[in-house]
Amino acid sequence: MKRSGYCGDIRESSIGKEIAVCGWVHSRRDHGGVIFIDLRDREGILQIVFQPENKEIFEAAEKLRSEYVIAVKGWVRNRPFGTLNTNMSTGNVELVAVELKILNTSPGLPFEISDYIDTSEELRLKYRYLDLRRPNLQKNFVMRHKISKEIRNFLNEEGFLEIETPFLTKSTPEGARDFLVPSRLHHGNFFALPQSPQLFKQILMSAGFDKYYQIVRCFRDEDLRADRQPEFTQVDVEMSFVDEEDVMVVIERMLARVFKMTLNLDIKMPFERMPYSEAMLRFGSDKPDTRFEVEIKDFSRELKNSGFSVFSSVISKGGIVRGLCIPKGASFSRSEIAGLTKFVGEYGAKGLVWMKITDTGADSNIVKYFKEYEIRVFISKLNAKSGDLIVFLADEEKTVAQGLGALRLKVGRESGLIDKNKFNFLWVVDFPLMEWDKEEQRWQALHHPFTLPKDADSLTKENAGRAKAKAYDVVLNGIELGGGSIRIHKSGIQKKIFNILDISDESAEKKFGFLLKALTYGAPPHGGAALGFDRLCALISGEDSIREVIAFPKTQKAVDPLSNAPAAVSDNHLKELGLQQIEN
């Protein structure tokens, strides 16, 4: 029996036609001596009717159970009056079976094949082949395909070349740990799986390819946070003879195309450009969610001579004081406010100062330490109203920004202030080139060490903390979709950066010598970007977790319950690789 169409594609236009469909038994019902089967395939569900008049296939249909794989031939007809199902795209029609073939059977299921299941993620991933049959996940992967197709179409039309870069490459650990692959032919030596194609795409620009792209798998052996994967996919782009605006415009147009073709949304361009310092001040984050108007305000200047010693002493030591208004937060109980204090404590804050705004001013056990005009300044700058709660943090700038930034998002989510129908894009620009690592007592590149400084000629180790990078991150609704930079294309500047980062000439040559040499042979000015493809797919599909748009994801412990990877290998295999296992 040859399939002539998909279950989910059958409509009134097929009425009176004989068709054949294949799929999985989604459900079975017996009504008044008639058997009804909901047959499911990739495109949807079609109701199949087995009538007792056709004794042979009726008896066969009685044996059908959930997830049996069958092929059915029959005639399409209108559903009888009163039995239409407006929740299904095929809800006006049904197939009256005249032939049935059972292609495979299935035992009892560990969970129901439904979009609404109450089961552990571990179990879902163990039986991922069943989990992936759920209609919502099927839709997610159809959407993922559409997104990759539109990205490729756009970049191809713009003159980009899709070029693959190596998966077996050299370990250059500057950031997350590499996944290492031992060499069988060269004992004691290892390949590394790439964290990104960064160095190779720069070399492709040096080779004269002008515009490159790749939708590429990347690997990072890092401690997994809430929604990270050890292997992930990114959209990788690089261009020659460009500046920051050139790259950002291409990425904007690509994203606008994707959102139009997938969600039929018209994305406003150009995206807002927001300096890093402004993002950290107003939103406490370098990936600000601008869908709601609650903003952080700085009061360090107004409070440097404050009678409240907690504030004035912090400011005198070089710290800052910033505040946030929580709409209608005056109704919070002391225990709820204590919960907020505990929350910001997770970001290093030592305490949370608060005031409840009333019709007559402010109410708190610390109000007495402030002059009346200071209270008015708080209320005015924070645009606070009666019934609101204003909170303050006093500490070093990074702690205050992170604490209030996280609290702002918590308030936005829990108070229903975020408009989930909005898609607010923006670029964060003017990043610091480097940040000081207190533990290692050295400068670290904020993005990566191949980013071009805004004023490379005047950069020294002494002024590195003030240097700005030609870097840019694209943010959507508080999520960093990706980022990029203009790269260093002269070996002398690259060596200077390595020197400031305390990477010795010997170490730089050992790790990056092939790049440094390529830069000496007439490398053009170039720049690019990389976008998190999994994250983009999750956002467009309306999913909170990227695991819902990755076919075979790992758990938070970096384990695949389906295949039980990672797994031990035999001693013989280790011996071939020149390795041996040692006891912990």
Curated annotation (Swiss-Prot):
ATP binds at R220, D221, E222, Q229, E480, G532, F533, D534, R535. GO terms for molecular function: aspartate-tRNA ligase activity; aspartate-tRNA(Asn) ligase activity; ATP binding; nucleic acid binding. Keywords: Aminoacyl-tRNA synthetase, ATP-binding, Cytoplasm, Ligase, Nucleotide-binding, Protein biosynthesis. L-aspartate binds at E174, R220, H447, R487. PROSITE patterns: AA_TRNA_LIGASE_II. Its EC number is 6.1.1.23. Aspartyl-tRNA synthetase with relaxed tRNA specificity since it is able to aspartylate not only its cognate tRNA(Asp) but also tRNA(Asn). Reaction proceeds in two steps: L-aspartate is first activated by ATP to form Asp-AMP and then transferred to the acceptor end of tRNA(Asp/Asn). PANTHER family: ASPARTATE--TRNA LIGASE, MITOCHONDRIAL (PTHR22594:SF5), ASPARTYL/LYSYL-TRNA SYNTHETASE (PTHR22594). Belongs to the class-II aminoacyl-tRNA synthetase family. Type 1 subfamily. This is Aspartate--tRNA(Asp/Asn) ligase. It comes from Endomicrobium trichonymphae. The gene is aspS.
